[in-house]
């Protein structure tokens, strides 16, 4: 065995997962109960001092046939709980047995330790380059009556403060059972008075940081829209009351799944915190036949004892290095212009060429053709599912226009919405059964469109074959994959009635299958995810697309909060952000061009406006922004991110530092001006205290320790929404 990250103490029946940053401890207790002991900072050895106290607690029952009233699964912190075993916490799993009961008593059976990390078939997952960089513990729990086995998977990386968990359920019985809930993980904490941080939102208002106390009872943060959703991102953090960006403990949980999800946080009668995370059990019922298995999505669990920045940096590193697979993840992202807010559906080839010509003059690197190029689509009422060029707009064919874009020295990108269908489409005329609906009922439209049954292979194959005919031309450099509605009328026509509870999850598996086939076939195409902006911004999506459109809201000031929340989990290279017109299309706000550019440079910079209608002054500013961005984008896209000032305040500040601490880019945004402004300072982070750094704008030189401990005064300017960027480089 090449690794030594997991130990088992046979005498005390304790597993210890450990590296230089974290330890995770679990033990086998009475009745084969798998008990949780500890997750936190690294300890070299464990001497069995955390055996849970034995107390005779009223109304907390005991093990079957046991006379020991001091041991109860109702109070013991556990690794995985089921319904019907005298544990009254929210269960991690619920099973419907052939006799109609939900009885399940999971007890320890065996364990094994493997080098590396197993792949998850059909699901996004973290991975290893070499087996010796991680080790995986698989603990098997069994119910002896039903002959169900639950494999709990725990992977620890050698150099990361991360535990990756998932669950496999195996039916070794003689009859089918129904899984009504299967969480990917459970975590119990004793003597912790946490606050919980989540990322709720709405369309054009995604991932706003929400922080609240946990009182006795159950909090649920979830989506049952069929996607990870704008409304509740599949992430949660438990933090101490005094935890901030740089200090305090933080436990982060991110689910690698793009469908319905559920995070349950419960403070029980004894003040203990109980957490479940996984697929939402809303309308979920999976038939598990004999000799079949069910695999849950993964959960990434991060521990930080140095605040939220360190938690985020651990997520960023893991997602970038061991979730993303695209070759583009390490490549500089091109500065693009997207025609959507410039033209909407009102365009033809000649009109687009004028935008392409202007993009070339301004130094942009890619033109992205958005919605409206296919079928006979002049509005959002038709043609979804018909992925053939609209001859009225492109009489010479799409390839002819792509050639023109390439001749100007730009890359060419194209918008698709492969999961959707319009009533008014050839696809619907030929295959009306492809449209997801409940038989005998009219389906609900959203944005005048409907959802395809992606759980069916024949439906996926049809869309795949249509897209291949376009993409095999080798004239497409980039794809924006959109999804502009939530799922409804959930039904899969090739499933029997007792398996309709599988339709939501089978849709997600079908989506992953189709997307995986395309990204595998076209490794030289940069894929960007999108769902009306950030409606499917999650770890699972990152496995297939290295960048995602963060929000349909392009207002720079609202983007501060959206991007701040996004950065809690997701690396900035994953987040696309565009400069748009002022007054803004979404809220009418008038914002300086400089500020719009500075905020967009937090992510992958692009432009979403009609370049041909800009003034000479605005055009000059674009040239200036693009020129400067090309100098700093390796740092801004791939550097270590530090959030310096919270977006909820009147100022928001952040910075990125390269891995050698030789270069840093800092941005400070002052939201509202005041007649008598406070004098504020910005202190930097992540620099080398022994290096000297030059401000490339002013040629002033400061010590790294000066910039981090003393900082500098922020400029005081008249007017709202002012931004200032600083570029520092280390000097000899």
UniProtKB/Swiss-Prot annotation:
Keywords in alphabetical order: Carbohydrate metabolism, Glycosidase, Hydrolase
Any single biological process term in GO: response to raffinose
Induction summary: By raffinose.
Transmembrane regions listed in the UniProt entry: none
Reactions performed catalytically: Hydrolysis of terminal, non-reducing alpha-D-galactose residues in alpha-D-galactosides, including galactose oligosaccharides, galactomannans and galactolipids
Active site (UniProt): 482 (nucleophile), 552 (proton donor)
EC code: 3.2.1.22
The keyword Hydrolase is assigned to this record: yes
Entry keyword annotation includes Plastid: no
Residues annotated to bind substrate: 370-371, 415, 447, 480-484, 530-533, 552
GO molecular-function terms, A-Z: alpha-galactosidase activity
General function of this protein: Hydrolyzes the short-chain alpha-galactosaccharide raffinose.
Annotated family: Belongs to the glycosyl hydrolase 36 family.
Subunit structure, as described in the record: Homotetramer.
Protein name: Alpha-galactosidase Mel36A
């Amino acid at each position: 065995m090449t690794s030594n990250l997991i130990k088992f103490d046979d005498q005390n029946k304790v597993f210890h997962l450990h590296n230089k940053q974290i330890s995770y401890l679990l033990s086998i207790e009475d009745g084969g109960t798998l008990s949780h002991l500890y997750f936190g900072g690294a300890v070299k050895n464990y001497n069995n001092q955390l055996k849970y106290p034995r107390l005779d607690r009223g109304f907390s029952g005991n093990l079957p046939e046991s006379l020991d009233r001091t041991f109860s699964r109702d109070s013991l912190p556990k690794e995985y709980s089921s319904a019907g075993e005298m544990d009254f916490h929210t269960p991690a799993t619920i099973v419907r047995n052939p006799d109609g009961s939900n009885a399940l008593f999971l007890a320890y059976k065996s364990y094994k330790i493997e080098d590396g990390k197993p792949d998850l078939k059909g699901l996004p997952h973290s991975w290893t380059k070499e087996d010796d960089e991680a080790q995986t513990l698989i603990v098997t729990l069994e119910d002896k009556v039903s002959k169900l086995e639950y494999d709990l998977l725990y992977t620890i990386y050698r150099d990361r403060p991360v535990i990756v968990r998932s669950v496999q359920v195996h039916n070794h019985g003689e009859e089918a059972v129904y899984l009504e809930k299967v969480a990917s993980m459970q975590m119990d904490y004793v003597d912790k008075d946490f606050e919980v941080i989540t990322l709720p939102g709405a369309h054009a208002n995604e991932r706003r940081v929400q922080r609240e106390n946990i009182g006795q009872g159950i909090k649920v943060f979830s989506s049952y829209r069929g996607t990870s959703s704008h409304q509740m991102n599949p992430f949660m953090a438990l933090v101490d009351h005094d935890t901030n960006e740089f200090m305090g403990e933080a436990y982060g949980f991110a689910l690698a799944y793009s469908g319905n999800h559920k995070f349950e946080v419960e403070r029980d009668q004894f003040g203990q915190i109980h957490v479940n995370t996984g697929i939402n059990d809303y309308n979920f019922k999976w038939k598990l036949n004999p000799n079949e298995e069910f695999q849950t999505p993964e959960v990434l669990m991060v521990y930080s004892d140095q605040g939220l920045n360190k938690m985020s940096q651990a997520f960023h590193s893991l997602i970038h290095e061991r979730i993303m697979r695209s070759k583009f993840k390490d490549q500089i992202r091109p500065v693009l212009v997207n025609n959507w807010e410039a033209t909407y559906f009102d365009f033809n080839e000649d009109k687009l060429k004028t935008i392409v010509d202007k993009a070339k003059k301004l130094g942009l690197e890619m033109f992205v053709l958005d919605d409206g190029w296919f079928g006979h689509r002049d509005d959002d009422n038709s043609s979804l599912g018909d992925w053939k060029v609209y001859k009225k707009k492109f009489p010479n064919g799409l390839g002819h226009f792509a050639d023109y874009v390439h001749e100007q020295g730009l890359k060419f990108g194209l918008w698709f919405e492969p999961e959707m269908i319009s009533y008014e489409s050839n696809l619907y005329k030929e295959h009306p059964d492809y449209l997801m609906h409940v038989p005998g009922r009219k389906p609900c439209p959203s944005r005048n469109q409907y959802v395809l049954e992606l759980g069916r292979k024949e439906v996926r194959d049809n869309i795949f074959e249509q897209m291949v005919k376009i993409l095999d031309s080798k004239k497409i450099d980039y794809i924006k994959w959109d999804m502009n509605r939530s799922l409804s009328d959930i039904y899969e026509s090739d499933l029997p009635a007792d398996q309709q509870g599988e339709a939501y999850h089978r849709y997600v598996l079908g989506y992953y299958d189709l997307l995986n086939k395309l990204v595998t076939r076209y490794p030289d195409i940069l894929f960007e995810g999108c769902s009306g902006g950030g409606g499917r911004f999650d770890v699972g999506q990152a496995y297939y697309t290295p960048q995602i459109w963060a929000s349909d809201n392009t207002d720079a000031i609202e983007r501060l909060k959206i991007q701040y929340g996004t950065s809690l989990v997701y690396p900035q290279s994953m987040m696309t952000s565009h400069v748009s017109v002022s007054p803004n299309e979404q809220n009418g706000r008038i914002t300086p061009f400089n500020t719009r550019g500075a905020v967009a440079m937090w992510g992958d910079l692009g432009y979403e406006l009609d370049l041909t209608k800009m003034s000479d002054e605005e055009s000059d500013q674009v040239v200036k922004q693009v020129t400067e961005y090309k100098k700093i984008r390796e740092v801004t896209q791939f550097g270590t991110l530090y959030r310096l000032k919270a977006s909820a305040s009147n100022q928001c500040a952040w910075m990125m530092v390269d891995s050698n601490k030789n270069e840093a880019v800092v941005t400070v945004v002052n939201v509202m001006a005041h007649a008598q402004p406070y004098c504020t300072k910005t202190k930097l982070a992540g620099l080398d205290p022994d290096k000297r750094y030059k401000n490339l704008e002013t040629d002033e030189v400061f010590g790294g320790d000066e910039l981090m401990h003393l900082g500098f005064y922020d400029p005081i300017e008249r007017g709202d929404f002012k931004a200032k960027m600083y570029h520092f480089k280390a000097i000899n």
